[in-house]
Amino acid sequence: MKYSICKGVLWQETDGEIVIVAPKQDPAYLNESGSIIWKLIDKGYDETKIVATLSKEYSEDDVIIRKDVNDMIKDLLKNEYIKESN
C-alpha cells in the first residue's frame, strides 16, 4: 500500500527529527526512525519498500521493522497526517 501526505499538513526537519503541523492537531514530533519513515512516505515509497529500506539501514529483524512501520502508519492515518493513495 502506498500513502501520501494529506493536504494542509506541513512538516519541517530540524536536527534529524521532523515536526508535523496539521489543521486541528497539536504538532507531532517524530524521532529519528519515525522521521525516516515519514520521508520515505513523502518520496512515494510503499510499505514494503519502506521496510526493505529500513532493513538495509538497521540490523533489526524484518518482522520487528514491519510491525514498527505498520504501527506508525496506522497512527499517521488515524491522525489524518497521511492517506492511502494509488
Regions found by a protein language model. Give the residues of each.
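Long, charge-rich, low-complexity alpha-helical segments
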Residues: Y29-N86
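Acidic, low-complexity/disordered tracts enriched in E/D and polar residues
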Residues: M1-D42, S85-N86
